[in-house]
Amino acid sequence: MSWVRSVAIRTALCRQVRSRYQSYGSTRLFSSSLRSWEEPEVVTKTPKADIDHEAVKAHQESSPLKSIEVPFTSLEASRKFDKSIFRGLYNSKMKNMTVVQQRAIMPMMDTKTGVVVRAKTGTGKTLAFALPCIQAALENPQQTQKGRIQALVVAPTRDLALQIEAEFKKVLQHQTRNVHRKTDTFVLIGGRKNDLHPKAKAAIVIATPGRLEAILRDPRMLPMFSDLKYRVYDEADRLLDQGFAPTLEVIEERLRDAKAEALEPDNHFKTALFSATVDDAVTNFAHETIGKEYEYINCVDKDAEESHENIHQGIVRTQSIKDSFEASFSYILNHINDKYFKAIVFLPTITGTEYYYRVLQRAKREELYDSETATKKYGSRILRLHGKMSQSARDRTVKEFRRTSHGVLVCTDVAARGLDFNDVSHVIQMCPSSSVADYIHKIGRTARAGARGKARIFISEPEMKFIETLQRERGIVFKEDTEYVKDETSPDHFQRLGSYEQDALEEFLRTFLGFAASVSGVYRFNKQRIVEESFALYRHILNDPSAKLSVGRRFVSEVLRMPGRDAAEFFDVPGGFDMRSSNDRKSKRTFMGDGGSRSDRGFSNDRYGNSGRSYNKSRSFDRNDRSYGNDRSYSNDRKSYGNKSYGDKSYGNKAYGDKSYGDKSYGDKSYGKSYGNRSNDRSFSRGNDRGGYEKRNYGSQSRNTYGRRDDSDE
């Protein structure tokens, strides 16, 4: 019996079953959830081929992350996949399935309604849903030729959508022209021309929510989605985190409407949700899109830590935000000449990313490290990635960082989820993340595919409540805890280099303060202390202890909720501050209190419930009664600040950092400034996928607004 049990755990299992299939000509059904084979009772078993199913099941339940090796060719026994799929896998040198693929592929094929799959990033989940989608396209070429899409994949960002497309291409490359014709794939994202039209004969569509919603609102395009076989939501938790719930609700309604045009009215598509976390919001979303009868597939060990066990996490404690930036800069300069140093540096805003990138570039030009050796010997690169960049520029950056084995990528949260880079040795975070889940996914950019990596967060004393939240809510264990002590004899390179970028520094401070207003409410930071620390950094770099920042009055009162008497120390506003307003003790409390009430959250991500996201079907859904951050239309009936709506006025598209805070309009006068290229992500939207550099005047005063939230469907 021990011999039989060992056979069940070895790779010979699949070959034996295939041999039995050839010998008896019987149908074998592969159960991915158990990784076992169901034998028809009419088949006589032989000792050689006998498999201890209980041993296999017990092995999986005891250690689901340590799977036995199962080759993709084992799926042939199910007779549910076209041979061209296995040819594509073979040509791409993909031999064995990961745990996610073993557990999810066949349930996706067999389900009548849908599946919810919990899997960490970097575990091969894209291929797990790619194979069923490709098979559906191969089985229904007649419908595709009649303009009917067979599979739809929805991703939260355009970078992730492009990465998903690349995974599909791995299977579809080196195929015959006939296979290519049956599996024609389209990507619908912002910043790229939409080539999808009713006569396009698309088989598979990969889209971001905003662009997909715009397509579905076009009556000419709606029939194309009438005969879907699969609908996949990748990174479902992030879709909800970023406030896409209303957009997903519209997508759901429009897909139901499309059924009226179905070639096969009785056909019902299957839905698959892939998510790194499955909380109440994801569960409610699954109930609304699939129903309560779905299969839940957990590919995460119940005893595993929330973050990857191969990541060496460490804290670098500093006394101030100024020290955090100096310490991180010194850390990079001290390690950038290491042979295998390949780091991702996360900052919370676009302008912060741009500023830090410029300072690193100056350090390279001034040879503050051995840049010649790093470049010539290791091929080192210093790159940036954020949402203000054009799509072509972002694509080039992603390709370059994937190719290089050495260097630094400075980026916003746009790269925190989905994007897969090989051999990242370090993840460096400069500030608290907007949510605990964001922190988890950022550090997940290192230690991919069984490798090891380091994650360092530079955190100031006023921000320590974020670390406490990580430890309390997710049980994060930091294996290294270091206190930064500045060497007073060493030159302050960050201050000197940063002073050359004064304009970029001012833009950075404005957006950073908007971000601080958001997270202060989430983690109950002392906002007064955060503002003081931010200006200490600003004044230190400028070497001006009394430097002030010019902002609009509403930025102080609405974004920071700061009394005029306190704000006068830091800000210049047109016409000055009305000091009498500082006697309003209530307003003073909301700013100076240690975190404040829920109503004083600033602009947190908590739009849809206590967890920061939810999906509630019963909530009224009216285009004129909602405000959106990125990739959604902006309300004309409400005053909108990024992801929250307040009152009855509209302040449209004014944005600070990576979150939108409104564009103010008063009659025929407008007030604001935005950066980048503007590309409307839907026909009815006033401002998503913004950019454009334009400066408008309000009366005699000129004021600034900044790009929208970066980690969106751009």
Curated annotation (Swiss-Prot):
Locations of Basic and acidic residues compositional bias? 619-640, 656-671, 679-697
Identify one Pfam family in the record: DEAD
- What are the GO BP annotations of this UniProt entry? mRNA processing; regulation of translation; RNA splicing
Q: What is this enzyme's EC?
A: 3.6.4.13
Where in the cell? Mitochondrion matrix
PROSITE patterns reported in the protein's UniProt record = HELICASE_ATP_BIND_1 (PS51192), HELICASE_CTER (PS51194)
Place the motif DEAD box on the sequence: 234-237
Q: Which GO terms describe its cellular component?
A: mitochondrial matrix
Keyword set includes Metal-binding:
no
Question: Sorted alphabetically, which Gene3D superfamilies does this protein's record hold?
Answer: P-loop containing nucleotide triphosphate hydrolases
> Which key words are in the record?
ATP-binding, Helicase, Hydrolase, Mitochondrion, mRNA processing, mRNA splicing, Nucleotide-binding, RNA-binding, Transit peptide, Translation regulation
Transit peptide residue numbers = 1-37
Q: Does the keyword Hydrolase apply?
A: yes
Q: Where is this region: Disordered?
A: 581-714
Q: Which domain of life is it from?
A: Eukaryota
Which residues are ATP-binding?
A: 119-126
Residue numbers covered by motif Q motif? 74-102
Query: Residue limits of the Helicase C-terminal domain?
Result: 335-498
Describe the location of the Helicase ATP-binding domain by residue ranges.
Answer: 106-296
- Reaction catalysed by this enzyme: ATP + H2O = ADP + phosphate + H(+)
Q: Name one GO molecular function term.
A: RNA binding
Report the main location listed first in the record.
Answer: mitochondrion
For domains, the record's comment is: The Q motif is unique to and characteristic of the DEAD box family of RNA helicases and controls ATP binding and hydrolysis.
Function of the protein: ATP-dependent RNA helicase required for mitochondrial splicing of group I and II introns. Also required for efficient mitochondrial translation.
What the record says about family reads: Belongs to the DEAD box helicase family. DDX18/HAS1 subfamily.
Under what name is this protein listed? ATP-dependent RNA helicase MSS116, mitochondrial
Taxonomic path: Eukaryota, Fungi, Dikarya, Ascomycota, Saccharomycotina
Name the gene behind this protein: MSS116
